[in-house]
């Protein structure tokens, strides 16, 4: 039932669209969009965007992996998806990296868009027990399928994508990466 200042209206009396001359406040409950692909329309705002419809929001967990032959002590990930933008956070503690494993992180809740630039950056918040001498460890999202680690070694001048040999025993990493789907 919709209550107005002067009277009440039953649900079967409401016709869409409803235009109200001010703010709408829900004192309890949620605003539920009942049709897939619909959302909050921001087209009344200035700008020249290609889309002004917020049609998706999701939070959840995922399980990051560097391959089926690795053994893990900790393996957890969290994500937030707003529209076509995804932010991943994850923690890995790898007990042993075995053949068939790599520095490619799989198990993503959403694949990066094949239409985005080849490399979309992230940040490694913490890394410990790299098997090789490295000045830094970075992370990026590859268009279409996965995220991957890279390092800048003390013996080279540029960044290189690494094989699983870069991961040492009890390798710890906390990282975040953002990309479009």
Regions found by a protein language model. Give the residues of each.
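Short, structured beta-strand segments at or near domain termini in extracellular proteins/domains
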Residues: 169-181
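Terminal beta-strand-rich extracellular "head" domains
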Residues: 92-145, 150-151
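Generic beta-strand structural signal
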Residues: 26, 35, 81, 140-142
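Residues that act as N-cap/strand-start positions at coil-to-secondary-structure junctions
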Residues: 12, 25, 71-73, 133
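Intrinsic low-complexity, repeat-rich intrinsically disordered segments enriched
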Residues: 1-65, 89, 93-98
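Residue-level detector of beta-strand structural context in well-folded domains
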Residues: 16, 22, 75-77, 137
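Surface-exposed ligand/attachment interfaces on beta-rich extracellular proteins
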Residues: 43-53, 60-82, 91-114, 157-169
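Substrate-binding and catalytic surfaces of secreted/luminal carbohydrate-active proteins
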Residues: 86
């Amino acid at each position: 039932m919709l209550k107005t200042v002067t009277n009440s209206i039953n649900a079967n009396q409401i016709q869409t669209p409803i235009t109200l001359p001010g703010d709408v406040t829900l004192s309890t409950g949620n605003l539920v969009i009942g049709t897939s692909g619909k959302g909050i329309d921001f087209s009344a705002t200035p700008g020249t965007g290609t889309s002004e419809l917020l049609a998706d929001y999701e939070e959840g967990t995922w399980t990051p992996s560097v391959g089926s032959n690795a053994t893990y002590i900790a393996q957890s990930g969290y994500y937030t998806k707003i529209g076509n933008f995804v932010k991943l956070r994850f923690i890995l503690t790898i007990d042993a990296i075995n053949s068939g494993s790599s520095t490619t992180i799989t198990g993503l809740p959403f694949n990066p868009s094949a239409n985005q630039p080849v490399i979309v950056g992230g940040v490694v918040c913490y890394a410990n027990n790299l098997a090789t001498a490295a000045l830094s460890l970075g992370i990026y999202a590859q268009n279409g399928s996965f995220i991957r680690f890279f390092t800048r070694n003390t013996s080279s001048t540029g960044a290189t994508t690494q094989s699983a040999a870069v991961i040492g025993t009890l390798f710890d990493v906390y990282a975040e990466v953002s990309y479009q789907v």
